[in-house]
Curated annotation (Swiss-Prot):
Its main location: Golgi. It is a single-pass type II membrane protein. Mannosyl transferase (ManT) required for the biosynthesis of mannose-carrying glycosylinositol phosphorylceramides (GIPCs). Maybe involved in cell-cell adhesion that maintains the integrity of organs by providing mechanical strength and facilitating the movement of metabolites throughout the plant during development. Prevents abscisic acid- (ABA-) mediated effects on development (e.g. cell size, flowering time, senescence). Probably implicated in beta-(1,4)-galactan biosynthesis thus being a cell-wall synthesis-related (CWSR) protein. The chain crosses the membrane at residues 27-49. Its cofactor is Mn(2+). Residues 1-26 are cytoplasmic. It comes from Arabidopsis thaliana. The active site is at D262. Glycans are attached at N58, N271. One of its GO terms (molecular function) is glycosyltransferase activity. This is Glycosylinositol phosphorylceramide mannosyl transferase 1. Expressed in leaves, roots, stem, and flowers.
Length: 334
């Protein structure tokens, strides 16, 4: 056999080998891709089956939730003003929450609640009765129209926990229950769903001056220093401190300006604890019209409040944090 023929045969063998190797690689790659896809699908199916086939997990968690910490549950403290349809919707919704003990409606209108309104709400609560326990409903009537009324001391509260909420905000009951669990782990602090932040002014001519910032600043920085009382848990003792111990000038300021009582409460709690508030992740449903936060000059007014309260307290008590409480039971990965 000549050298040319040997060379041709070797070239043909090399070409056949390369083609075979390419086919093998394609085969292995296709098999690997299919296997990986199969594993992913199997993982998802197994996870779903495991969650659905272990009802004892959720039931045991629910039992632990009911017996842990404050066995009496929490009091819903709802602020309202001439929005009766919203009030009815909110009370009807929260009456279904399993750990709710009572509802106190902060009433500051010049006329008392109508008998038809009271009858409607009481009937709603009767229909929502569970395990023989009917949620107590009370109207806390105030003669003066003041934002401070939402934090007026209630001496005969049965629960330590107070869930302060506006009448136009709805959270799923399981979300409220989770926030209550978080509060039970830190009952001296404020636990809520609506974070806000203050920032120190960097200019030299404004030493110890702070700017109030809203949600987008929190989202961008990942930092907050307060949670708003429009949707927050706190201990009932802070109602007494707000009413009896906080400087009267602050309460007068909030009454006159009709703003910032929520910031004042955040200052009060942070000053008492030297600890940050806790932000809880939760889907919020606002069923009312646009609030005062959309009115022009809102941020400037809130900034003025922050600096006024710093002067009253003699320091900035709010504490920065980046912690966020998330219910891992609702996440695939955590």
């Amino acid at each position: 056999m000549g050298g040319g023929e040997v060379s041709k045969e070797m070239g043909a063998c090399s070409l056949a080998y390369r083609r075979g190797d390419q086919k093998l690689r394609k085969f292995v790659t296709a098999r690997s891709t299919k296997f990986l896809l199969f594993c992913c699908i199997a993982f998802v199916l197994v996870t779903i089956v495991c969650r659905s086939s272990r009802p004892w997990v959720n039931s045991s968690i629910a039992v632990a939730d009911r017996i842990s910490g404050s066995r009496k549950g929490y009091t819903l403290l709802m602020n309202t003003w001439k929005r009766y349809d919203l009030l009815k919707k909110s009370v009807s919704h929260y009456a279904s929450c399993s750990r709710l003990d009572s509802i106190h409606i902060v009433w500051s209108e010049p006329n008392p609640p109508s008998e038809s309104l009271k009858e409607y709400l009481h009937n709603v609560l009767k229909k929502k009765t569970r395990d023989g326990h009917e949620v107590e409903l009370r109207f806390d009537i105030n003669k003066e129209d003041s934002l401070n009324n939402r934090f007026k001391e209630i001496k005969d509260l049965k629960t330590d926990a107070v869930f302060s909420i506006d009448d136009d905000i709805i959270f799923p009951c399981h979300t409220v229950d989770f926030a209550f669990n978080v509060w039970e782990s830190a009952p001296d602090t404020m636990v809520g769903f609506v974070p806000r932040v203050h920032w120190p002014e960097k200019s030299n001519d404004k030493a110890n001056y702070y700017t109030y910032s809203g949600w987008w600043s929190v989202w961008w920085s990942g930092t907050y220093s307060m949670v708003l009382s429009k949707a927050a848990f706190f201990h009932k003792k802070y109602l007494s401190l707000y009413t009896n111990s906080m400087p009267a000038s602050i309460r007068e300021f909030t009454t006159k300006n009709r703003n910032c009582e929520d910031i004042a409460m955040s200052f009060l709690i942070a000053n008492a604890t030297n600890a940050p508030a806790i932000w809880v992740k939760g889907k919020i449903y606002e069923i009312g019209s646009t609030g005062i936060s959309s009115i022009g000059g809102h941020t400037e007014k809130r900034t003025h409040c922050v600096n006024r309260f710093v002067a009253e307290f003699g320091k900035m008590p709010l504490v920065y944090t980046s912690m966020k409480a998330v219910d891992s039971r609702n996440l695939w990965f955590w």
